[in-house]
Amino acid sequence: MDVLYSLSKTLKDARDKIVEGTLYSNVSDLIQQFNQMIITMNGNEFQTGGIGNLPIRNWNFDFGLLGTTLLNLDANYVETARNTIDYFVDFVDNVCMDEMVRESQRNGIAPQSDSLRKLSGIKFKRINFDNSSEYIENWNLQNRRQRTGFTFHKPNIFPYSASFTLNRSQPAHDNLMGTMWLNAGSEIQVAGFDYSCAINAPANTQQFEHIVQLRRVLTTATITLLPDAERFSFPRVINSADGATTWYFNPVILRPNNVEVEFLLNGQIINTYQARFGTIIARNFDTIRLSFQLMRPPNMTPAVAALFPNAQPFEHQATVGLTLRIESAVCESVLADASETMLANVTSVRQEYAIPVGPVFPPGMNWTDLITNYSPSREDNLQRVFTVASIRSMLVK
């Protein structure tokens, strides 16, 4: 894997810097490095593809070295270099695709394609060994079963979940009280609602709670907490739990009271915040518990009182909500996030070449399915294919 990264980095640098008019002295070190790559690869044969519709391709390396010059690089020099660069780039691209479409239930962190297995040989270590990529560093750590650490921006840690629970209901669905939520990606939105605006509740107050368990532990997380859930701030028609009917949700938004968010690890509270909004942090956690209250306003103008009558019919629903958004965090496991396209790269290649469903990943690389059942086998394979996707992205956008 590190050899593949070194190949890609050398080729990227060569493609960017070996251009007509450049002083040879400015790129002499790069050209020596490029020549070392050619010397190491010459005489070797590789085969890629042969799975799904990914065609079989044979690769033979027999290239001349780039020479030295006292002057600027001329058009002939650059054209010779370009021909070599283009072939090598095409080779790396195909090795990456071949690796991205393969999976294994056992030791999925290790190279799965014949071409990458061959590149893992000791003879290829002479190719500008470079271990500076975060993905490569973590791949090496995971390969040795040592602790890894990825930094993510808006990590897709929450499987998609959108539903509601009713703490008070009746067949007519005209006096409901409960909680509805939407968890997806890096965001939780949860709302508590009461048709009667807590008119008969103790102290005219309704208590709500929402607990979310993560599939992986997050550490050093920067989080935004807001006293609102905008996705539940407009009217909608909702299917009943049994699917037999529908009911009307017509919210009027109030500010939540006694808001508390707890971050837990293995059932132990690590961080707690009360009535604190904006930016907060959590050290390490695998569970988030949100609790908040809806309090009936003790004093109301006639217009507000008309929204929340003392008896049925209730045409509006008093609603309070919270939004929790994970802005950044560190995780030992690889995840899809907002700043990278690894999941899209892997999925698009597998779709383009009609790769059959294997023993590890769900059909279509469905992320909700994948993260919901994030087994050690999936973790190993995902880290490997994401690492390869990061290497490919250096050369192919």
Swiss-Prot record:
SUPFAM superfamilies referenced in this protein's UniProt entry, alphabetically: A virus capsid protein alpha-helical domain (SSF48345), Viral protein domain (SSF49818)
Residues where Zn(2+) binds: H153
GO biological process: fusion of virus membrane with host plasma membrane
GO molecular function: host cell surface receptor binding; metal ion binding; structural molecule activity
Keyword Phosphoprotein belongs to the record: no
Changes after translation: The N-terminus is blocked.
Keyword Metal-binding applies: yes
Family: Belongs to the rotavirus VP6 family.
Protein name as annotated: Intermediate capsid protein VP6
Species of origin: Rotavirus A (strain RVA/Cow/United Kingdom/UK/1975/G6P7[5])
